[in-house]
Amino acid sequence: IGMGLIGLLTAQMLKANGCQVIGVDLDQSKLDLAKTWGIIPFNPKSDGDVVKFVENYTNGIGCDGVIITASAKTDEIISQAARMSRKRGRIILVGVVGLNISRAEFYEKELTFQVSCSYGPGRYDENYEQRGQDYPLSFVRWTEKRNFEAILNAIAAGNLKVKEMITEVVGIEDYQKIYGSIGSSKSIASILKYNEIQRNFEVNVTINPYIKAAAKANIGIIGAG
């Protein structure tokens, strides 16, 4: 739910891993882009009730998982996610929505709800991010760093399309054009372009003075065996 930048990236990753993906958004242009990648588009403004659509599409089963990447104050989104989920399905909140959850909707289906914490394990851990203390791969397979590596590998392999999502390039001096209308803009991804500045770099190399070896060797022996 929510086909902005994060939603489109998420949908592509799911599709690349063999999932059937339904993308829900009110912006038809974003849905049209998602459709080119094999994602099933649904616009509640023109297509009707998304819960009924999911029920019909899944033969009455419901979604295995619902990932919310939308940003809205309404509680209706979390309610829709619960109603379109199958029994014992999973709901992951990546975006920001109202969380006045109906106990009955979650209780009757035994749904699992989780809030995603940014990039993954290691985020906000000072030892990990500042001191480079990694988590053992055998215990924590997908850390913040390994998640980024997987994304970069997916882009390199062509499984994750990012160029098509860049809708505008703005000079750094005009940054307010992006941030001033970020809530109402139809743009998906914006690039801030910095002016190229010629700089002269000086490299200083410090050479330690040559130390001549002593004429007479000194040997120390530890252990009387």
Predicted regions and their residues:
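Mid-domain Rossmann-like dinucleotide-binding core that forms the NAD(H)/NADP(H) cofactor-binding site
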Residues: 1-47, 52, 225
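Hydrophobic alpha-helical scaffolding
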Residues: 24, 44, 71, 137-142, ...
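Residues in the short beta-alpha loop(s) of Rossmann-like NAD(P)-binding domains
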Residues: 27, 97, 119, 196
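Glycine-rich cofactor phosphate-binding loops and adjacent beta1-alpha1 units
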Residues: 32, 40-114
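Short acidic-hydrophobic, aromatic-tinged amphipathic segments that line or gate anion-handling sites
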Residues: 40-46, 166-174
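C-terminal capping/lid region of NAD(P)-dependent oxidoreductase domains
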Residues: 60, 65, 92-96, 111, ...
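C-terminal substrate-binding/catalytic core of Rossmann-like NAD(P)-dependent dehydrogenases/reductases
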Residues: 101-164
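Phosphate-binding active sites in nucleotide-utilizing proteins
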Residues: 218-225
